[in-house]
Amino acid sequence: MANAIIETAKERFTQSHHSLAREYASIRAGRANASLLDRIQVDYYGAPTPLNQLASITVPEARVLLISPFDKSSIKDIERALNASDLGITPANDGSVIRLVIPALTEETRKELAKEVKKVGETAKVSIRNIRRDAMDEAKKQEKAKEITEDELKALEKDIQKATDEAVKEIDRMTADKEKELLSV
């Protein structure tokens, strides 16, 4: 039963790491990356549809994204969604494909994005600590219900803390890597 608590916590830590990785992938770093468009929803025949389901997204050059709609009639809807997004990039529509030229980041923009990365990292750490709290509470419940002894509780709390420390260390590493990517010219 005690192992189940740790396994559940570790699974939730992994989910937090994956979520953070997706979040970091959507923060542009001056290079074209198809994952920048993962969160873009296009109003396609009245239904919000992910852009990657309506078009193929390729990276022909280091700072260019090429969006080729499967249905050419949806090109205006895609362009409208890109203009409405918070990307800050103006799409160039040539009738059959849309080009997004990723501008080089200014020093000021890089620093702003680095702050955003830190903020997102801190939010992920809070999530990890909440998972730890839930696991600790579950362990204490089991001890109260006499399912585990007090010594087992102490050992379990130690294991939970160790897993938490590893999860936080991974978040710190991911954050440092993303900051380095942003601040390198």
UniProtKB/Swiss-Prot annotation:
The name this protein goes by in its record: Ribosome-recycling factor
**Function recorded in the entry:** Responsible for the release of ribosomes from messenger RNA at the termination of protein biosynthesis. May increase the efficiency of translation by recycling ribosomes from one round of translation to another.
What is an example of a Pfam family matching this protein? Answer: RRF
In the UniProt record, the gene name given for this protein reads frr
A GO CC term assigned to this protein in UniProt: cytoplasm
User: Which taxonomic lineage is given here?
Assistant: Bacteria, Bacillati, Bacillota, Bacilli, Lactobacillales
Q: Which family does it belong to?
A: Belongs to the RRF family.
Q: Which InterPro entries match?
A: Ribosome_recyc_fac, Ribosome_recyc_fac_dom, RRF_sf
- Read off the Gene3D superfamilies from this record: 3.30.1360.40, Ribosome-recycling factor (1.10.132.20)
Species assigned in the record:
Streptococcus equi subsp. zooepidemicus (strain MGCS10565)
For molecular function, the Gene Ontology terms on record are: ribosomal large subunit binding
What keywords is this UniProt entry annotated with? Cytoplasm, Protein biosynthesis
